[in-house]
Amino acid sequence: MNSDTIAAIATAMSPSGIGIIRISGEDTLDIIDRIYRSKDGKKKISKCKSHTIHYGYIYDEDEVVDEVMVLLMKAPNSYTREDTVEIDCHGGVYVMKRILETVIKNGARPAEPGEFTKRAFLNGRIDLTQAESVIDVINAKNDFALKSSLNQLKGSVLVDIKKIREEILHEIAFIESALDDPEHISLDNYPEKLLKIVDNQVYNVDNILKTFDNGRILREGINTVIVGKPNAGKSSLLNILVGQEKAIVTEIAGTTRDVLEEQINLNGITLNVMDTAGIRDTSDVVEKIGVDRAKKYAENADLVIYVIDASTDLDDSDYEIMDLLQDKKAIILLNKSDLEAKVTVDMIQKQIDKKIISISAKERIGIRELENTIKDMFFQGEVTFNDEVYTINVRQKTSLQITLKHLQQVIQTIKDGMPEDFYSIGLMDAYEELGKIIGESVEDDLVDEIFSKFCMGK
């Protein structure tokens, strides 16, 4: 338990209907008793039952600062497992600062970013994966990201990681016991048994690792790149999807020379839409850089939208783009369907097996079909998303990859016929690495770094 008491404004520092000042620590009740007075002047918060709310006033010595409601949560039944008070006041910036200053003057110190959640972790109320999911809940950009983050906040990752760790620890204990007491505990045929157990854990860890791309998409959105030749209608399409003029649209080929990126929400699905330079052979140095970037973004995209000007004949640039997209998740748009067609669906289908939609960006024809196609691809898992109960972040992914290597080394050790004491070394390495994910064996510097990313008052 921490010995000092912290305080912070937990709501946004802008005028609003209500502001909240949060206090947590061993002196919380003494501080609130000094600055709070009930309407009749008789009630002391410290004497009240936990999880109750009280109307009254905050005083700075003999001066009324604000009319408030005070929510009391006594240890250990609070967010931090410490005595905690939340002061609900009027949401003016000045009044919130004034109350915070009064709290600090009476014995608290300003909280660091994320320190309330850090105390919840250090006091054992949540593990490190749950703490990280708090950030994801706050930053969720759609219903799917929120659902995933809330599942993780409930401890879904913790349950799976703990189960794997317990099974590994059981084998470590068995090996050590057998080595200490070989007369009573036999290791005959044990390598074959352990091989199956470790192989199963490799499978389990690998399954958790597979959720990483899902997590990135849910947190950050689907990286969607628009490619095509100059003047195919890429910028017009971006403007339609965004709902306003973001890209310059002209008849001059090569107007877009760099990547324009906008984020849109398509019925709860977040898309990071990038309009790229038109792909063609060019002697212009600046435009060539833009073309190279367009190809690179397309290679790394979750989804590519390839816009073809259907009113002009296909050329080498079109075939180059289609070759680039053979193994990518892509939608092909035959734009300018309001004009005489020189490129048909049948012609494209002979070159590449992708969803093809005829549209007119100018007349806004086919846009709804495009949006529905993107939604269908998302829900059917064609852009790596599926309805997993949780997703992992980069830190957790790294530890899982290291764990996987340790387990694979154990398998190799068994196959090489090494002595049994070598097995427990690799298993212990895997056990400790999994502990880093949930915070049971993690360095203080890493904990500090994780919680420094939180907002103030959380």
Located regions from the model:
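A glycine-rich (often HGG/GG-containing) alpha/beta subdomain
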Residues: 1-147, 151, 155, 331
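C-terminal-of-GTPase-core extension/linker across diverse P-loop GTPases
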Residues: 2-9, 13, 143-265, 282-284, ...
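Short glycine-/polar-rich loops that comprise or flank the Walker A/P-loop
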Residues: 16-18, 51-53, 300-304, 327-330, ...
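Switch I (G2) and immediately adjacent beta-strands of P-loop GTPase domains
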Residues: 54-66, 70-74, 254-282, 300-303
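Glycine-rich, N-terminal phosphate-binding loop of Rossmann-like dinucleotide-binding domains
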Residues: 91, 241, 276, 308-311, ...
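Conserved beta-strand segments of alpha/beta enzyme cores
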Residues: 109, 270-272, 355
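Generic enzyme active-site microenvironment
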Residues: 273, 307, 333
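Inter-motif core of Ras-like GTPase G domains
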Residues: 287-311
